[in-house]
Amino acid sequence: MRRSVFASLCLLFLAGASAQEYSNNAEQNRRLNALAKEYPSLTSLQSLVKTNGGKDIWLLTIGSGKTASKPAIAVIGGTEGNHLLGTEMAIGFAENLLKASGSDSIKNKLAKTTYYIFPNMSPDAMEQYFAKLKYERNGNATETDEDRDGKLNEDSFDDLDGNGRITMMRVESPVGDYKTHPDDARVLVKADANKGEKGKWLLLTEGIDNDKDGLLNEDGEGGIAFNRNLTYKHSTFMPGAGDFPATEKETRALLDFLYDAFNVYAVVSFGANNNLSTPIAYNALAARERIVAGYLEPDAKANSMVSDLYNRVTGTRDAPKSVSGGGDILSWGYFHYGRYSFSTPCWWVPKAKPDTAKKEKAFSLDDPAANYLRWAQQQGITNTFIEWKQVQNPDYPNQKVEVGGLEPFVLINPPYKMVGDIVKKHTDFLVKLADQQPEIDITNLKTEKLGNGLTRVSLDLINKGALPTHSKLGERSYFLKKLKVAVQTDKQEVVGGKKISLLSSLDAGSSVSFSWLIRGSGKISVEAGCPTAGVKNVEVTL
């Protein structure tokens, strides 16, 4: 009996401990399978493929009824392996949404909208957070020869101070281009030669030149990064990008599914790219290039509208600027998939104001590490900076070498105790985003008897949503189905007007009128819509 009670207490302790930390791959799988088991009528969980590291790429579909026939939002987490928050956001959103599925508002939402959730597109890389040697990694388990010397993974990081962390390494050198931060000696910043400043340190990642080719840590474990492996502006042959677009099984699995999912009208990804806090501005020159390189003006306006919604709901501010490196999911979602595409890191280190009570002064030089350390101190967060420690490095036999700096992951992943509130805000945003979706309706239906067996049928087709049925760029794409209006008859005959009409798009709040002359009696039906905006069907008695 005592042994049983003790075992139960241990299990409760372990459950509580795991609840206070980011989820590893096994825990992610457990949470997803628990949702599928608890909500079988609202969910479908499938593994699209296994990575080269043997980990599942999951797709969790949430919705009621025929999910493939309703407008959908694709939610993508784990776009970068070092961004654990993105996967917590995706799974946490699913948990919050399903927990509230008994309420009328969410029940109605899931009757009209489908969510396709890809919780983690970088499971191989993300496990490095939980490994014996902890460092930030984005590449999967595919073996690569980054330095093109015919050898694989021969020059990885080395844990010189033996603390199980890979941080930074500074080498005292007369040609060093880094100096200590004027307001925080723990931090190194680049010396400004234009101001006559001189550096004292070389700043490198912790390790040794194992293959003696003059390069440091250039060919270690961690192959292809998902968020560099997509098709738009792919950086071919660059480290982490792959020799050509979509080389990886997980990339192809996502693309194969989404290109067949004609009902997706928006893609929301969690990662380093950000067009939600600050929308992408319209650039007329880029938009007019032969190969479109900028958002078309109506799509930039849609981005701005959704950005306003995001900022109102989440209350975020002071977002860092983001620049796409090519091959990323945000750019692919718009330029190649033709959908409304949004991305956010969900959290960033707030700007830390000086504590006047402690006689702190504003930083004379902005730096992310210095700002983080001040913010962490104000929040009572400890153990996130590793003091500089002198080590021996055979590459620098007669020089002072020190290892230290910020703990891996802390600049882009908040303390786990903050995650719940961040997930709640982004759940609210994703629910409210569905309120903006395009929605087709038929109004002003009229019939007029003209004699000789003829009846005029007229109606207005409207888009009740806040977004157009298609992005402007998407109007050019094969991978979006046009808006179709079709008259379905039995023995009747359409003698005036097109029996089937196709429209490229219908703007938010706009309408278009249709009229037909029908010979015959009885009942006909008119079906109108498209996968991204839903289908409406009305029956007409002649």
Question: Which residues fall in each region the model found?
Answer:
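N-terminal signal peptide c-region/cleavage motif recognized by signal peptidases
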Residues: 14-15
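Edge beta-strands of extracellular beta-sandwich domains
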Residues: 534-542
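Metallocarboxypeptidase
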Residues: 44-45, 56, 76, 88, ...
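Intrinsically disordered, low-complexity Pro/Gly/Ser/Thr-rich segments with frequent PxxP/GP/PP motifs
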Residues: 492-521
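Active-site/substrate-binding loop(s) of hydrolase catalytic cores
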Residues: 69-70, 84-85, 92-291
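Short amphipathic, basic-aromatic surface patches that mediate peripheral association
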Residues: 461-476
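Short glycine- and acidic-rich boundary segments immediately preceding or forming the N-terminal edge
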Residues: 20-56, 419-422, 429
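Short, aromatic- and glycine-rich surface loops/edge beta-strands on solvent-exposed regions
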Residues: 522-531
